From Swiss-Prot:
The active site is at E1023. InterPro entries: 6-hairpin_glycosidase_sf (IPR008928), 6hp_glycosidase-like_sf (IPR012341), Gal_mutarotase_sf_dom (IPR011013), Glyco_hydro_65_C (IPR005194), Glyco_hydro_65_M (IPR005195), Glyco_hydro_65_N (IPR005196), Glyco_hydro_65_N_sf (IPR037018), HAD-like_sf (IPR036412). One of its GO terms (molecular function) is carbohydrate binding. It is an enzyme of class 3 (hydrolase). This is Uncharacterized glycosyl hydrolase Rv2006. Induction: A member of the dormancy regulon. Induced in response to reduced oxygen tension (hypoxia), low levels of nitric oxide (NO) and carbon monoxide (CO). It is hoped that this regulon will give insight into the latent, or dormant phase of infection. Its EC number is 3.2.1.-. GO terms for biological process: carbohydrate metabolic process; trehalose biosynthetic process. GO terms for cellular component: extracellular region; peptidoglycan-based cell wall; plasma membrane. It comes from the Bacteria. This protein serves as an immunogenic antigen, inducing gamma-interferon responses in whole-blood cultures from M.tuberculosis-exposed adults in Uganda, The Gambia and South Africa, indicating this might be a good vaccine candidate. In the N-terminal section; belongs to the trehalose phosphatase family. In the C-terminal section; belongs to the glycosyl hydrolase 65 family. PANTHER family: GLYCOSYL HYDROLASE-RELATED (PTHR11051), PROTEIN-GLUCOSYLGALACTOSYLHYDROXYLYSINE GLUCOSIDASE (PTHR11051:SF8).
Length: 1327
């Protein structure tokens, strides 16, 4: 048997599709015939052998078995062998049912069955195939029955295994009892369908007999499939088969579509669709009948429902709209009188574009005459069926049976199918209609694709259309299939096919809700263009004093690398600083300062790939700082992550030139960056020389206060210049990381490569080309520069140089690479979007912050060994070190991209050995994570700090800030709460928590006089206070944040151990040598940790309230900006350690990480009474004593004020949003963005104003968003659910996308609901 070979089938193999088919009837006549012959042959062979072997006894007849003997004694009689033996005078004892010898009746029966089964495998091979196919149908939920004209076939079906797989059998005995005529009359098949509860028009017939196939065709069954293993396909097709297969394994069984009742309502879950539009522009396609019009008794009476014309008109003004109907095109145009639409008739065989141009399917025109003849024949054949309407259209014949009596419908459909089959036309079905069309591969889905190809690129970038198809009919399923992976299908619900299945993503209830949906979509699209585009950050005019700030704000990146938005023609200067950084590429240099040897590890500034300038007629090289600028505009497209610089200038010779540059760091190919430069001459003709280089002579000199330190991290470059490309190789001087940059520069005009002159340009550390081309006035030329950057740290890399060259060789042109990049960003925006309706400026800054977060930590980061650099990949402040900033970053990512958040935890887990060594050196068990780290997890905090106000170097004891470990533990537990991933706890999460908890238990020392555990000599989040007056660098005692969070970590470690399966828990305890005594001590510490208070306020640390009060007004009046109060006081010969003055939130961090209930519960465990009414006093106390010397301060203050519903929370939120764009830290943003503050602004929206918490395996919401600001919307993930949250004031709606995740519990201020996939709940909270 040939298995899986499709014979004589046009198009793909036949498919049993639950959208069109409810049941399958398998004809078994051939199987029964073959099995009966095999059964007779088995008995004949076995008994003839037995009678020959058996010794002759008196009265026994040993003659061979005859056909009459088989029929009388054995056919259909499992126990008939005893009667046969008696008739032959042979007497045998019954024996046992397990006998396998020939001296008992049972033995003979069993031995014969073995012979039968052996012959059956070769004689009836179809049996196993049919059984397997039937089981596939059952798994897919398709009802299945068997039909045969035979009687008494049970024993043969039992032997083939088929008796078990068919729930319904209709055989010759049943049809005889009912008086039904034999095949090819379809009566028997129709009775079988009836017993299955299926309509023949939605039922499939499968048979290998020509009479059975004819019966299927005569009965009007939806699909007739012939099984042919003997090359008789032509006869089977002529007998009525729609398709012929050699084996049922070739038939596809589809099961993935959903019942319409289970599909989410598009209006209720509109936010999901809106999210898809974050990075794409829609094109909307609609059916007419049942979608834009009500279903009516007479097709000619259909009209647009009220409001449809207005909705279509409004939507067409914002995006392409098409109506694709089964009606004739002229009919559609007459009923949809709205300008600006694509209109398609006859399922898209004929179309008219918005500009009036007419199109038709050329292949279909050959069928026009045949359709006309078919229409005439059908009119004649159906004239006796009352209510039947034959509608002849140019490219189809539709037979409507809405008004036909139920008992006549099957005959009508059968007649249409017979005629269509005979005429070579395609038969399709729809709402109370069966239709004949040209038998070519064309349907509404193909028409949708055809129109889509002619719409051109979407405004947001090439190939970023989102096709949306809305329809109600079975014929619309072709369109739903077309958009299944690239767009959105929306089915309009009706009951004429029951709760049928559909491939649509969403549903709408009726044409009126379709109008609501279209109007909502039009409104949203219109609103997006009415406002100043919140997807762009625009700088008008050139300002050298702000250029470095703009470079940081407009840096492009992809999680692997970041490249500052520097002018390509500019080298390092007071106004410009080219910088490119790859995550995790560090190098250490040594200096001698103030008699001390100082080692500093830095994120390395890599060779400048961007370097590009030009000159006209051999004049001066272009420099933005020296020409006369006539216009200048810089645009950062946040949606596309592309930076565009457009300028027009006049040079010393009076020549006016326009230059437009665009660049990106590919989110699709992380090692790739690209720059496109277009030069247009306005009033001159002459030569243009481009100089395109890769510059390896770069240093780390961005931060002024580091200039006294060594800055050259790269060795002398090796440069290889090729025809139109260059390869630069170098490595870091201490860490030995190989770096390769390959760049290709090509010139283009009107899509064609320009034949330009290339000359090598190179010196010690720079290499590339001078490229000359001639321009005439009004002409333009475009240089495309594509570069690839690799290091020896990259995975799956032979050498950095080979990889860079190979990647560059595979890279296409700029437009293609940019298109791939924009697509990747569209996918990211769909997962990470936040929408603030009507708040353009705030939304722009939120998107800027999201962009920089994703440019620093992206899905590519998950493939790297890299942490969260405090200043992103945008600059060199803090030397690119990893601090505790992941505490503000990871919770954002856990709820959006859990895999990326997991990679940040894995980064910390890989550095667990270093943290253990640090703890061991300090005399403790467990893990002590460093305050600052770079390449390997060692402590790399600076030993000396330069105060730029005083010019003095002072000791820097920041390595006492051990609370980084608390942040690591918090992120690990938050990740587990989001994902429910217990395997993470098994793999590494529990070990991480236990080792961090161990360290804090060891650091906490019992003070017998107080009966409390104390933690001494640390630095808290404040950072200002490194000690007490007179002991400036010894740390402070009992920092409240540290002590409380240490208890929190201990409890989470204990909980994590309890969550582990017994075997895994035992293995971990053995691995760590964790004793029962230790765990007892954990419990003791978690109940007796000391927490300082004064006057009902949580003290920042013990003794804080005894410090002097600062004259805040005096210092603000004298200095204005006092954010870095520590530097001001040190320059005055004073110390911030003397005062109740904090750099940033410290004690209030407890209210940032913990809910008030959690904090109060922890303090109660420790024996402290702390009431909710004490929280406002604590907040106010520290707000008045904080200089906000860190951008994180405003994040925490906004958080705690918003949770308390305080009116000034939004002031702090807006301060967070503007912290970098306004450079509120006084020039620090140019050194690198403040990544944690940017992430914090997102988290304020994502978790704070939503009240989103994860506690006790439950999602907790407590929305608190100012209603006047309009709705707040965003997607997130939780426990395998894809969720969308929409908040307005104190109410919210939460929608779960379709899927198979278990229901989740959602709590809102005491009220708990369960949310299932594909459903929406509303949470409204009483005041």
């Amino acid at each position: 048997m040939r298995c899986g070979i499709v014979v004589n089938v046009t198009g793909p193999p036949p498919t049993i599709d639950r959208r069109y088919h409810d049941a399958v009837i398998v004809g078994l006549d051939n199987v029964v015939d073959k099995a009966t012959r095999v059964h007779a042959a088995a008995w004949t062979k076995f008994l003839d052998d037995y009678l020959t072997r058996r010794p002759q006894r008196t009265g026994e007849d040993h003659c061979p078995l005859t056909h009459d003997d088989y029929r009388r004694f054995l056919a259909g009689k499992p126990d008939g062998v005893a009667d046969f033996l008696a008739a032959r005078g042979i007497r045998l004892p019954p024996g046992s049912p397990t006998d396998l010898t020939d001296d008992t009746v049972y033995g003979l029966q069993n031995l014969e069955r073995q012979t039968f089964l052996q012959l059956l495998n070769t004689g009836v091979p179809e049996g196993k195939s049919i059984a397997s196919f039937a089981r596939r149908l059952q798994v897919a939920g398709v009802r299945v029955a068997a039909h045969t004209s035979h009687r008494n076939y049970g024993h043969t079906l039992d032997a083939t295994g088929l008796a078990e797989v068919f729930a319904v059998f209709v055989d010759g005995a049943v049809t005889a009892e009912l008086g039904l005529p034999a095949e090819p009359n379809p009566a028997g098949l129709i009775e079988t369908a009836k017993r299955l509860g299926a309509n023949p028009g939605r039922c499939v017939v499968i048979d290998s007999c020509q009479t059975g196939l004819r019966a299927g065709r005569n009965g009007g069954f939806a699909l007739v499939i012939a099984v042919d293993a003997h090359g008789d396909a032509e006869n089977l097709l002529s007998s009525g088969a729609d398709a012929v297969v050699a084996d049922l394994a070739a038939v596809t069984v589809g099961s993935g579509d959903a019942a319409i009742s289970t599909i989410p309502d598009a209006l209720q879950v509109y936010s999901q669709l809106k999210r898809l539009l974050t990075g794409r522009r829609p094109a909307v396609f609609l059916d007419f009948d049942g979608t834009l019009s009500d279903i009516v008794e007479r097709p000619e009476a259909a009209t647009l429902v009220d409001g449809a014309a207005e909705a279509l008109r409004a939507l067409a003004a914002q995006c392409p709209v098409a109506v694709i109907s089964g009606r004739d095109l002229a009919d559609v145009r007459n009923r949809v009188k709205v300008d600006g639409l694509w209109l398609a008739g006859s399922h898209g065989f004929e179309l008219v574009a918005p500009d009036g141009s007419h199109h038709q399917n050329a292949a279909a025109t050959a069928a026009i005459d045949g359709l006309a003849e078919a229409a005439a024949q059908l009119a004649d054949a159906l004239r006796e069926i009352a209510g039947a309407v034959v509608e002849h259209k140019r490219f189809a014949v539709a037979v409507h049976y809405r008004n036909v009596a139920d008992d006549s419908v099957d005959n009508l459909i059968a007649a249409v199918r017979r005629l269509g089959h005979a005429a070579g036309l395609r038969v399709t079905t729809g709402r109370k209609v069966v239709e004949l069309r040209p038998d070519i591969a064309w349907d509404k889905g193909k028409a949708l694709d055809w129109i889509g190809e002619r719409l051109g690129p979407a405004e947001v970038g090439p190939d970023l259309r989102l096709p949306i198809y809305i329809g109600d009919d079975l014929t619309d399923e072709d369109a739903f299939d077309a958009v299944r992976f690239t767009g959105v299908g929306i089915v309009v619900r009706h009951n004429e096919h029951g709760d049928r299945r559909s491939a649509a993503t969403f549903r709408l209830e009726c044409p009126y809700t379709v109008c609501q949906f279209l109007s909502q979509l039009a409104c949203d699209l219109q609103e997006a263009v009415q406002h100043d585009d919140p997807w762009t950050l625009v700088f008008h005019g050139y300002d050298p004093g702000q250029e470095r700030l703009r470079e940081a704000l407009c840096a492009v990146g992809n999680g692997y690398l970041g490249s500052r938005g520097c002018a390509p023609e500019s080298a390092e200067s007071e106004a410009h600083y080219p910088g490119t950084y790859v995550a995790g590429v560090y190098n250490q240099l040594t200096d001698h300062i103030e008699g001390c040897t100082v080692d500093n590890e830095s994120l390395v500034n890599l060779p400048n790939w961007l370097s590009l300038t030009f000159r006209i007629d051999g004049g001066a090289w272009f420099n933005v700082d020296t020409v006369e600028l006539l216009s200048y505009r810089q645009t950062f497209d946040l949606r596309r992550a592309t930076l565009t610089r457009s300028l027009r200038f006049r040079d010393a010779g009076g020549r006016v030139t326009t230059m437009t540059q665009e660049r990106f760091a590919s989110m699709n190919r992380p090692n790739l960056v690209a720059l496109q430069t277009r030069i247009e001459s306005e009033n001159w003709s002459g030569t243009v020389d481009f100089r395109s280089l890769v510059d390896g002579g770069v240093h780390n000199t961005l931060v002024d206060r580091y200039r006294q330190l060594s800055s050259q991290h790269l060795t002398t470059a090796e440069i290889e210049v090729l025809a139109d490309s260059v390869l630069l190789r170098t490595q870091t001087s201490q860490s030995g990381i190989a770096i390769a940059v390959a760049a290709r520069s090509t010139l283009w005009r009107d899509g064609q490569r320009v034949d330009a002159q290339y000359r090598v340009a190179r010196d010690t550390n720079r290499g590339g080309h001078d490229i000359q081309v001639t321009l005439s006035a009004g002409q333009s030329v475009t240089l495309e520069k594509v570069a690839t950057i690799f290091t020896s740290r990259d995975a799956a890399t032979l050498t950095a140089a080979i990889s860079a060259q190979r990647c560059l060789g595979e890279a296409g042109r700029y437009a293609e690479l940019c298109q791939q990049h924009v697509r990747a960003w569209a996918r990211l925006w769909e997962r990470c979007a936040i929408d603030l309706t009507g708040n353009t400026e705030e939304l722009r800054l939120v998107r800027l912050h999201l962009l920089h977060l994703l440019q620093t930590i992206s899905p590519h980061t998950a493939e790297l060994d890299a942490g969260v650099p405090a200043r992103g990949l945008n600059g060199e402040a803090y030397r690119g070190h990893v601090f505790w900033d992941a505490l503000f970053v990871a919770p954002v990512l856990s709820l959006r991209m859990p895999k990326v958040a997991r990679s940040l935890l894995d980064y910390r887990y890989r550095r667990l050995p270093a943290a253990r060594r640090a703890a061991h050196r300090a005399g403790h068990l467990g893990a002590m994570y460093p305050w600052q780290s770079g390449s390997d997890g060692s402590e790399v905090s600076q030993q000396l700090h330069l105060n730029p106000r005083s010019g003095r170097w002072t000791p820097d004891p920041s390595d006492r800030a051990h609370h980084v470990g608390l942040a690591v533990a918090y992120n690990a537990w938050h990740y587990y709460q989001v994902t429910g991933d217990r395997q993470y706890l098994v793999d590494c999460g529990a070990e991480l928590l236990v080792e961090i908890a161990r360290f804090w238990v060891g650091l906490a020392k019992l003070d017998d006089s107080r009966g409390r555990y104390l933690i001494r000599g640390v630095i808290g989040p404040d950072e200002f206070h490194s000690g007490y007056p007179g002991n400036e660098y010894d740390g402070i005692d009992n920092n409240a944040y540290t002590n409380v969070m240490a208890v929190w970590v201990i409890l989470r470690a204990m909980e994590a151990l309890d969550l582990l399966p017994l075997t895994d828990r035992r293995h971990l305890i053995e691995k760590l040598g964790l004793t029962t005594q230790e765990r007892d001590q954990w419990d003791d510490v978690s109940r007796r940790m000391f927490v300082p208070f004064h006057d009902g306020v949580i003290s920042q640390f013990e003794g804080y309230s005894e410090l002097a009060e600062l004259d805040w007004d005096h210092y603000r009046h004298r200095y204005g900006n006092i954010q870095r109060l520590d530097r001001i006081l040190e320059a005055e010969g004073d110390s911030v350690n003397n005062y109740q003055a904090s750099k940033q939130a410290d004690a209030l961090m407890l209210l940032y990480l913990l809910s008030s209930d959690e904090l109060i519960g922890l303090l109660a465990r420790l024996g402290y009474r702390f009431a909710p009414t004490q929280i406002p006093g604590t907040v106010d106390y520290y707000l008045a004593r904080t200089s906000d010397g860190s951008t994180l301060s405003a994040v925490v203050h906004a958080w705690v004020l918003a949770r308390a519903n305080r009116s000034n929370a939004m002031e702090y939120f807006r301060q967070v949003l503007r912290s970098d764009i306004a450079d509120v830290q006084g020039g620090t943003t140019q050194e690198g963005i403040h990544l944690a503050a940017m992430a914090g602004s997102i988290d304020l929206l994502q978790r704070c104003y939503s009240g989103l918490e994860l506690r006790d395996d439950r999602l907790v919401l407590s929305p608190q968003w100012p209603e006047a600001l309009g709705p707040l919307e965003f997607p997130f993930v939780y426990r395998r659910h894809q969720l969308s949250l929409r908040i307005s004031g104190r109410s919210a709606t939460l929608t779960a996308e379709s899927g198979d995740a278990e229901p989740i519990e959602v709590e809102c201020r005491g009220h708990v609901q369960r949310l299932r996939c594909g459903h929406t709940i509303e949470v409204g909270c009483s005041r």
